[in-house]
């Protein structure tokens, strides 16, 4: 399994006083996952036995 992840967020921030702040954010994200057909999920009960 491979995983790539990339994220960027930028934006201005203004603090007016101790109780009020204003900000605007813009972002971009990239993700990629690859796997192969041999991957599987084994389902078990709460005692560890396969169902």
UniProtKB/Swiss-Prot annotation:
Instruction: Please state the span of the N-terminal signal peptide per the UniProt entry.
Output: none
Question: What is a single cellular component term in the Gene Ontology annotation?
Answer: host outer membrane
Q: Which InterPro entries match?
A: Enterovir_OMP, OMP/PagP_b-brl
- Matches recorded under Pfam families: Ail_Lom (PF06316)
Superkingdom of the organism of origin: Bacteria
Query: Beyond the main fields, what else does the record say?
Result: This protein is encoded on Rac prophage.
The family annotation for this protein states: Belongs to the outer membrane OOP (TC 1.B.6) superfamily. Ail family.
Protein's UniProt name: Putative protein LomR
Record organism: Escherichia coli (strain K12)
